[in-house]
């Protein structure tokens, strides 16, 4: 019997399956310490052991904030928007998905002004504006950093693949679970009843195509059941025989009269006949 994996080993196996270890061909000089090796094709492999340690550190920082609403998770990248919304749903934090409004953390007259205690971003490149703003107001920043990500103004860098939708969803899932475990909301001994698939990005076009395919399959399955008592062959034969009998009889009756002169009908039959008979029967008068 194989020994049971520890929580860290199970999490690393999940991150491997999600592709969190795959970096890029470029490496920032500050990210070299998190790179394990370089593949033959030039892709750098991230050390997931250090990724797990940084996830634990980030979870401790988030748990230290008394009010969960003072934590903001932000993602401008489309693949990370669903993940930050799910992270905020389960941890009680706020989520900002989509384009960042300049001045959100620095302009107090802005309608969307916010003063978080901790900021969590998905990519230091696409989320460069909120990182630069939080640096002005001394807000700690946690960021998922790839091998080519700049670490300027980033306080806690979590080395991982921040470009794939499975990787981003897995990272936010693990971070949310660690936060809930440290708060005592869920027990570390029991598995979390939330699936990691809920944090993955879903393409609206793929969902629409899938729903349409399911509807077509259901309609095709219901069609034979509705027509089970209908015999198309017998109905076609009956219709053909009835049409032949009726059309043939009428056609034959009309065909036999083709050699005869057509009988007058309408005004000619009534007026013409009476006029001929009356003219022949009247005797000449006045001659």
UniProtKB/Swiss-Prot annotation:
UniProt-listed InterPro entries: Ribosomal_uS2 (IPR001865), Ribosomal_uS2_C (IPR032281), Ribosomal_uS2_CS (IPR018130), Ribosomal_uS2_euk (IPR027498), Ribosomal_uS2_euk/arc (IPR005707), Ribosomal_uS2_flav_dom_sf (IPR023591)
Family from the record: Belongs to the universal ribosomal protein uS2 family.
Major localisation: cytoplasm
GO terms classed as biological process: ribosomal small subunit assembly; translation
Assembly notes: Component of the small ribosomal subunit. Mature ribosomes consist of a small (40S) and a large (60S) subunit. The 40S subunit contains about 33 different proteins and 1 molecule of RNA (18S). The 60S subunit contains about 49 different proteins and 3 molecules of RNA (25S, 5.8S and 5S). Interacts with ribosomal protein S21.
Tagged with keyword Ribonucleoprotein: yes
Pfam families listed in its UniProt record: 40S_SA_C, Ribosomal_S2
Cellular location(s): Cytoplasm
Molecular function terms, GO-annotated: structural constituent of ribosome
Annotated spans, Disordered: 249-287
Taxonomy, superkingdom: Eukaryota
Signal peptide: none
Cited function: Required for the assembly and/or stability of the 40S ribosomal subunit. Required for the processing of the 20S rRNA-precursor to mature 18S rRNA in a late step of the maturation of 40S ribosomal subunits.
Assigned keywords, A-Z: Cytoplasm, Ribonucleoprotein, Ribosomal protein
GO cellular component: cytosolic small ribosomal subunit
Protein name per the record: Small ribosomal subunit protein uS2
Transmembrane residue ranges: none
């Amino acid at each position: 019997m194989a020994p049971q994996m520890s929580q860290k080993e199970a999490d690393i196996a999940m991150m491997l399956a999600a592709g969190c270890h795959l970096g890029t061909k470029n490496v920032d000089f500050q990210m070299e310490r998190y790179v394990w090796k370089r593949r033959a094709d030039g892709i750098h492999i991230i050390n997931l052991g250090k990724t797990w340690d940084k996830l634990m550190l980030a979870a401790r920082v988030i748990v230290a904030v008394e009010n969960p609403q003072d934590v903001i998770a932000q993602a401008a990248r489309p693949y990370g928007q669903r993940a930050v919304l799910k992270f905020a749903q389960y941890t009680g934090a706020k989520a900002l998905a989509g384009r960042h409004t300049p001045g959100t953390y620095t302009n107090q007259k802005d309608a969307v002004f916010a003063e978080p205690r901790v900021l969590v971003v998905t990519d230091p490149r696409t989320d460069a504006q909120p990182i630069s703003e939080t640096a002005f107001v001394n807000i700690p920043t946690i960021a998922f950093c790839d091998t080519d990500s700049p670490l300027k103004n980033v306080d806690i860098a979590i080395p991982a693949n921040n470009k794939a939708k499975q990787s981003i969803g897995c990272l936010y899932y693990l971070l949310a679970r660690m936060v809930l475990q440290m708060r005592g909301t869920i027990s570390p001994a029991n598995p979390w009843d939330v699936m990691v698939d809920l944090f993955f990005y879903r393409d609206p076009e793929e969902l629409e195509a899938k729903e349409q395919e399911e509807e077509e399959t259901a309609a095709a399955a219901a069609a034979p059941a509705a027509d089970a008592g209908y015999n198309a062959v017998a109905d076609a034969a009956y219709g053909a025989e009835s049409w032949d009998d009726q059309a043939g009889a009428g056609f034959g009756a009309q065909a036999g009269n083709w050699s005869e002169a057509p009988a007058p009908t309408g005004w000619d039959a009534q007026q013409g006949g009476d006029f001929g008979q009356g003219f022949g029967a009247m005797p000449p008068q006045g001659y």
